[in-house]
Each structure stands twice: as C-alpha cells, then as structure tokens.
Design a protein with these regions (language model features):
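Repetitive helical segments and hydrophobic/amphipathic motifs
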Residues: 11-12
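C-terminal segment of classical bacterial N-terminal signal peptides
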Residues: 15-22
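A residue-level marker of the well-folded mature domains of exported/periplasmic proteins
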Residues: 23-351
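Bacterial N-terminal signal peptides that target proteins for export
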Residues: 1-8
Length: 351
C-alpha cells in the first residue's frame, strides 16, 4: 500500500511539473495574408512577419493570391481556417468582401487582425494601420504642394491607384480631395484612374491618362504599383520634369525614378515593421494579453510606441457610425512614423 501511495505521489508530482511546460510549449500558427504576392511591399512585410514569428516561437505562414482577387482571398481564409490556424493577419482587398469568411473564422475561435487595408471592425479585432486618412491624405497633398513655386497657383491634378473599392487607398485619396477642396481651391481634379495592382496595366493606364489629359500638372498615386507604373509611363512619353508624380511605394521600387529625376518625392511607412506588428498583435491576443484603446505598447526590436486609437479615427460611416466606433477592445494600432524619400536619403532605406 505504501509503495502504491508513493507511486501515486510521484505521478502527481511529475504531472504537476510537466503540465505547465506542455502549456508553455503550445506553438501557435498564424497566417499572414497579403492582397497579392510578388509585390515588393507585401513581400517585405511578409518576410518581417515570418521573422517576428521566429522571434516569438510562432509558426507564421506567408501566402496569398497571385492576382488581386477578393474571391481568392476568401479561398485562402477558408483554407487557413480548415488547416487549424490560430490567427489570420490580413490586408483586405475590399472592406466587405471578406466579411462572411472572417465571420466563420471568428466563430471557430480564430483571431483576426487586419493590416494595411481594413474590413468592417465587426470582423476583426484590431487594425495595424500605417496612418489614419488625415495623416496620409496630408502627406500626399504636401508632397505636391512643396514642389510648386506657389502652392496656391492653378494646377490640374489626377488620382491613379488600384481600385475604387479598396479601403485604405480610397480613404487616403478622399481625404486628400477634402484638403484640396478646402486649402487649395485653385487645384482642379481632372480624373480618377485605377489599375488593379497590375504593373503593366499601371503603365498603360498611366500613359493613357497623360495622353487624355495632356495639361495635367500633378498625379497622386496612393498605391505601391500605380506609383512606379505612372512614373514609368511619364518616362515612356518623355515627360520627365513636366508632370509632378507622388505616391506611396517602397524605396527600392521608386529609387530608380527618383535618381533619374522623374520623381522628386515618394513616401511610405516601414512595411516590414507593419508586417512584424501584425504578427505581434495577433500573438498578444492569442496569449490572452489585453490591448486597450487609449493605451500604447512597444514591440521588441522596433523603435517607437504603437498607439491604440478608436475606430472612429479612421473616418467614414463604416467607422464613425458603427457601434464599435469607440470600443475599448477593438480599434486601430498606429505605426510610429511615416517616411518621405528623396534623392538625398533614398539609399538609406533597405526595403
């Protein structure tokens, strides 16, 4: 009997020692889903997302559609859910097109975080955001204004980006339009053009824009594919120095156009930091750590504080009229800084 009791005690002690370690060794699986693969912006973000996973001891899979397709993104979400992923970090091609797939994922306990481009807040927890529309719309307009002898002079402006439905780019472009209407009343907006994140199409659309509107003075491209595509179109038509073109893309993508003088200024944020932050946010939530609107947090190895702000800061009905507009456990996580690239600093950036 004594031997049995000793054996039982030994088993219980071993179980007590093993159980915490077993729990600690739980390895989460996080899917990192871009709008499209093969694009430098998303490849850099994906690489840093995977690296952050390694730092955290988390399995991170970077994969997504080869073409910019909402239907393809839905397929990837469903596949990740069926494969047992614990979290999905997604850059959405459409604010509503992924809702049902994300709803299904959340019903199965999958943590949803968005990055770069958001969905309806009801279908995610937090949005890792490069900057609210007022911040990024201002960056776009300022890059044009600072290249003019007189910012209040009469000019003709065009917008060229990926799609009329993509959440992020439209919010920045629409806020830029508001700034133009209120602060630069002599700027006339001629047209809005879209090239669906396809570089050859961006060049073609860019050339057609220049031919259709030969008097255009500035083209604003809040899209990492349209911006270099428009710059290439300007070079193809030998219009370098005649048209201001600004926008968002990686420094490695726009560098050649800046060095040739076709582009004077471009901008972005560190998309690698954004990718890493998306995975880190999902990891915190999986571990049960609270993220509260109004707070801020640091990420090891990344400079600056990540502020957590209310959904309403993003602007628009989807945010301002939502019952989650001022939620405390559902909101927007802002990157610490934005970057402006010129010929003087372009070589400092390695992404």
């Amino acid at each position: 009997m004594k031997r049995f009791a000793l054996l039982l005690i030994t088993i219980l002690v071993l179980a007590a020692l093993i159980a915490p370690n077993a729990m600690a060794e739980k390895q989460y699986k996080i899917a990192f889903l871009p709008k499209i693969i093969g694009n430098t912006f998303f490849e850099v973000a994906g690489a840093h997302a995977v690296d952050m996973g390694k730092q955290l001891g988390v399995e991170v899979t970077y994969d997504g559609p080869a073409v910019a397709s909402v239907a393809e993104q839905v397929k990837f979400i469903n596949t990740f859910v069926n494969q047992g992923y614990d979290a999905i970090v997604v850059s959405a091609l459409d604010p509503n097109g992924l809702n049902q797939a994300l709803k299904r994922a959340m019903s199965k306990g999958v943590v949803i975080v968005t990055w770069d481009s958001d969905v309806d807040p009801h279908y995610r927890t937090f949005y890792v955001n490069q900057g609210t529309p007022d911040i990024l719309g201002r960056v776009l307009v300022d890059m044009v204004a600072t290249q003019l002898p007189d910012p209040q002079q009469k000019i003709k402006v065009a917008f060229h980006y990926s799609s009329p439905t993509v959440t992020d780019q439209n919010s920045w472009a629409k806020f830029a339009e508001k700034i133009v209407a209120s602060e630069y009343k002599n700027w006339e907006i001629l047209t809005w053009q879209y090239s669906e994140m396809d570089f050859p199409k961006a060049v073609s659309v860019g050339e057609q824009l220049l031919k259709t509107y030969p008097d255009v003075n500035a083209i604003i491209c809040p899209d990492s594919t349209a911006f270099p595509g428009q710059a290439k179109a300007i070079e193809n038509l030998n219009m370098g120095g005649k048209v201001i073109v600004v926008g968002f893309t990686t420094p490695s993508t726009i560098s050649q156009y800046i060095k040739r003088g076709t582009v004077v200024k471009g901008a972005l944020w560190d998309c690698g930091v954004q990718g890493a932050a998306g995975v880190y946010t999902a990891y915190k939530l999986l571990k049960g750590e609270e993220i509260k609107v109004g707070s801020s947090f640091a990420i090891p190895g990344i400079q600056g504080e990540f502020k957590v702000v209310p959904n309403r800061m993003q602007g628009g009905d989807m945010y301002e009229k939502s019952d989650l507009s001022d939620a405390k456990d559902n909101g927007i996580i802002l990157l610490p800084e934005r970057l402006i690239f010129t010929k003087d600093n372009i070589d400092q950036y390695k992404f």
